[in-house]
């Protein structure tokens, strides 16, 4: 009788498609041990969570990652795209966020299905020299992403307290450390405050957009008709993509999902992947609306026929430091202060996510763990150096252009995180039965190779055009060409190597086919004992990631 009840319980917990002959492989980590997991589905149905409660238990990683899509780098590129090209580049934002949703969901699926995040899988898969190169490029991406946060914070301090931008850059070295230190006294309240301040800025731009009333027809054309006609439009489009699709976010998202307890069953993993997809979709939809509002307001105000000469000059060289006038219609004289507070919150919240990304990149590639404040201090000191030099020499205008350069660096860095993600998430040796479907494989590779192709085209044509048009002596141009062209060739060869290299390290293994009951138990997260439907021991689901301060 007990055996019948046990078999009935097993059958109830199996997926509908299970026929007893599945070849599904079981997730294990790179050391060969079964993937740590907890199966909540075996509890009595009356105690199971409802759909919404279960979904809310997975909420957190996607919204934390989405803060990167509202950072000062995004605001800067949005403002300049609107001022220079009106609504022409809205399609870039739409495509970029659709692409971001695709790859962020792949990153989440990779972490859930393998129990390892992207940098750990890279360490296991690639040879030593390749591994160290990928680690170095990932660290450069984190530092490039930190530059807009540094400059954005400096601009906010300049507006609030009228201090020089270069001094504000120095102050950023302490501001984020203070914010990280305050987390121990109530991180959820602190993150809620940051979110409120960021969405205050969003509400301001939505209110301004309602006031200026951008023509709906032109906005829709900009969203759905691809066009690159204005001077510098290609560079601005690359900068927009670089600001939207950040390499370090892929490492971060694949690690954050491991802080959630996911059952090691077909249904459990599939449910987790679906919930993370829904959460990421909601977060990125909000981010798209905010980016749309910023570009629309900037494009409408800066192209108005009754624009004053003073504001026309500001639009000609629009930066975060001078953009508060765009909100005067809604906020009046207090526009600059409220705008500065929102930019400050945006920079600080994005820096926290960058600190976590850098920590998991270092831990995954090098198995080296640092305290968060030390990690932040190292990253921030490196990011401060170029920001300080440029702000001293070029002032706020030069600092604003540095944000665009940092966004372009992120775009060129993207293939070295994106290609491993696409390959691992489409690989049977890594994902087993949870690998991407053929439709997702085709879509993700088309989008990925399209962005990589645009990067290579812009890199080559932009550099050749600069060599032709600059006023340097011919000898200097020849010397620069000798240095840069081999680097471009190495970049292309590295992309080709990562694309066509075959995965060799297996992180999935076949279950014991000689024991059908053991395979059934594995499918349902049951213990190996056949005397009763015991729960799997609550093994650590990644305690090294469980201290991430995510809202529950």
From Swiss-Prot:
The chain crosses the membrane at residues 55-75, 88-108, 133-155, 159-181, 189-209, 238-258, 275-295, 338-358, 377-397, 402-422, 438-458, 478-498. Pfam families: Nramp (PF01566). InterPro entries: NRAMP_fam. Glycans are attached at residues 11, 306. It is a multi-pass membrane protein. The keyword Membrane applies. Signal peptide: none annotated. Probable divalent metal transporter. This is Metal transporter Nramp6.1.
